Amino acid sequence: MQLTLDRLTKQYGSKIALDRIDATFEPGIYGLLGANGAGKTTMMRLICDILKPTSGEVTFNGTNIREMGESYRAAIGYLPQDFGYYPNFTAMNFLLYMASLKGLNARYAKEKSLELLETVNLSEVKDKKIKTFSGGMKQRLGIAQAFLNNPQILILDEPTAGL
């Protein structure tokens, strides 16, 4: 597995958020550190194919991710900085909904959701509505959804916020 950023640039109007970034990621754990506004979230969104680069490219195992489409997105698990929860969903319903968006079959989705709720210590509240959860509980639920599809690449933007 290799993820490569090649002269990756993102510009918003006259503001350059990322300027010709080159990096190669092999299997391992990486952290991005930088000041507010340094472009960390922008870089993660480019890696996740949420944003289109102004120039440069992101490749996964030698192929441009923009050409890979669904097959690339299936390899990604992503927890955004400001995750959108559905307050009237239960934890279980939320994970099942996210699993359906990721194209997972219903039986697997239920088994994996129960497993992940146990892993993030939310199994006892799986039938409670998300609006009753603390910030930390919501964050753990977000982490669980990022693992639903057994991703090859896991991108977590401020994963400890609210814990």
Segments the model singles out, each with a brief description of its role:
Residues C48:
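Helix-to-loop junction immediately C-terminal to a conserved catalytic motif
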Residues G56-E67, S71-Y72:
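Conserved ABC transporter NBD signature motif
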Residues L96, S100, R107-V125:
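Conserved ABC ATPase "signature" region
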Residues K129-F133:
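Conserved ABC ATPase signature
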Residues N150:
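Conserved catalytic motifs of ABC-family nucleotide-binding domains
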Residues L154-D157:
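Catalytic Walker B motif of ABC-type/P-loop ATPase nucleotide-binding domains
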